[in-house]
Amino acid sequence: MSDYSKLEKCLDYQFKNKNLIIEALTHKSFKKPYNNERLEFLGDAVLNLIVGEYLYLKFPKSNEGELSKIRASLVNETGFTRLANEIKLGEYIFISTAEERNKGRTKASILSDAFEAIMGAIYLESGLNTLKPIILRILEESYDKINLDVLFSDYKTALQEITQARFASIPEYKIEGSYGPDHKKEFEVSIWIDGKNYGKASGKSKKLAQQAAAKIAIDKLKEE
């Protein structure tokens, strides 16, 4: 059995049932009788609850719509990948040889799913009161400053102002596709400015994916 002590130290949690951590780290490509999809489903629900409560208490003057948008900026593939990297989760996941060749250990979708599964596993074994401080600690370590200015920015509007000034044109968003089960569908959007592709992003709705893509484009334009 592999040594998970470093991962458990990063989590500040020791699994009593090691089979649970193995299941949480096993991607479906690994072709075992088990994989992390069920734990991922559970983790997604629990993360939404914990982050939702955290934001409710942190931003007492924000309305429901604002809180939903702030949570959506954290509880998504990009956000979970960031948290997964915080605990170096890619070093521990079980993936197929083909996924290894395709750099699966750094793939956002695989890392995000594994992070949700690990959180689901901790919840299953030890409950909400144990899991909550773990999630909030990782969240606050990964995001230096969680505030409304950072999390509730309208990147699409900001980008359009930049492109109109620089290129006399507006960005074009193309829906590249959608994937995932109905309860957890993700949309992928590419962004084009003046005929040039500035990247892709995904989100739980087309609007959120467009916001994420706009942020990527803003960051790239700053470097040009």
Curated annotation (Swiss-Prot):
* Residue ranges of domain DRBM in the record: 154-223
Give the chief site where it resides: cytoplasm
RNase III domain boundaries: 4-127
Q: Give the active-site positions.
A: 44, 116
PROSITE patterns, per this entry? DS_RBD, RNASE_3_1, RNASE_3_2
Q: Which cofactor does it need?
A: Mg(2+)
Report the superkingdom from the record. Answer: Bacteria
- Provide this UniProt record's keywords sorted from A to Z: Cytoplasm, Endonuclease, Hydrolase, Magnesium, Metal-binding, mRNA processing, Nuclease, RNA-binding, rRNA processing, rRNA-binding, tRNA processing
MF terms per GO, please?
double-stranded RNA binding; metal ion binding; ribonuclease III activity; rRNA binding
Is Secreted one of the keywords UniProt gives this record?
no
Task: List the GO biological process terms.
Answer: mRNA processing; regulation of gene expression; rRNA processing; tRNA processing
Reactions listed under catalytic activity: Endonucleolytic cleavage to 5'-phosphomonoester
Keyword Cell wall biogenesis/degradation annotated: no
Please give the family membership noted in the entry. Belongs to the ribonuclease III family.
Q: What is this protein called?
A: Ribonuclease 3
The organism encoding this protein is: Aliarcobacter butzleri (strain RM4018)
Q: What is the lineage of its organism?
A: Bacteria, Pseudomonadati, Campylobacterota, Epsilonproteobacteria, Campylobacterales
